[in-house]
Amino acid sequence: MEGVTIVDHPLVQHKLTLVRDKSISTKSFRELIKEIGMLLCYEVTRDLPLADTVIETPLATMHSAKIAGKKLVFVPMLRAGTTFVDGMMDLVPTARVAHIGLYREPHSFAAVEYFFKSPSDLGERLAIVVTPVVATANTAVAAIDRLKERGAKDIRLACLIAAPEGLERLRGLHPDVPIWTAAVDEGLDENGFILPGLGDAGDRAYGTR
């Protein structure tokens, strides 16, 4: 699908297999999501602009490259997105972090917002929405809608797994938002959960039901 990149690096796929396993502990689940977040961040930021700069090494003066002209804001979707984004922050510690709290109404699957906090200069930043799962995409669409309302112009999305139905809806409503995912699963069940999926990422990360 155009605009969707599947990150098939062996390390990502290995760690995703471990994450899917229902027998792992909450601690292992959180640690693995953080590690995958770091690996996906590497791919999502691959095309950041570079500028030449002059530095002094211990032995000589040299020209070298630094990221320039692009400020970042990570946008984890609560709850499990906060664990996912920790690995990204390890790579880009100077990035800002916005938070969006959305839950999916269990009967209609509609997205309900309960929290939103972001930097005031969203229009000047590359916003990377971070969510473990894109199932129906209702919450992802609502998050992107909200970011655009607040002035964000350059938005990307990173997730662990996605359903074809969710990707189609997200790309249809926001074709300007590219997506990076570790896997595209078979589809959705009657309750809107991804099959085979990985379960409820928030519950598995924090030991709730």
From Swiss-Prot:
Gene for this chain: upp
Binding-site residues, uracil: I194, G199, D200, A201
Details of cofactor binding: Binds 1 Mg(2+) ion per subunit. The magnesium is bound as Mg-PRPP.
The organism's place on the tree of life at top rank: Bacteria
Binding, 5-phospho-alpha-D-ribose 1-diphosphate: R79, R104, T131, P132, V133, V134, A135, T136, A137, N138, T139, D200
Annotated source species: Bradyrhizobium diazoefficiens (strain JCM 10833 / BCRC 13528 / IAM 13628 / NBRC 14792 / USDA 110)
Family to which this protein belongs: Belongs to the UPRTase family.
UniProt activity-regulation remark: Allosterically activated by GTP.
UniProt cross-references to HAMAP family, sorted A to Z: Upp_B (MF_01218_B)
Annotated CDD domains: PRTases_typeI
Record-level Gene Ontology MF annotations: GTP binding; magnesium ion binding; uracil phosphoribosyltransferase activity
Protein name: Uracil phosphoribosyltransferase
Catalyzed reactions: UMP + diphosphate = 5-phospho-alpha-D-ribose 1-diphosphate + uracil
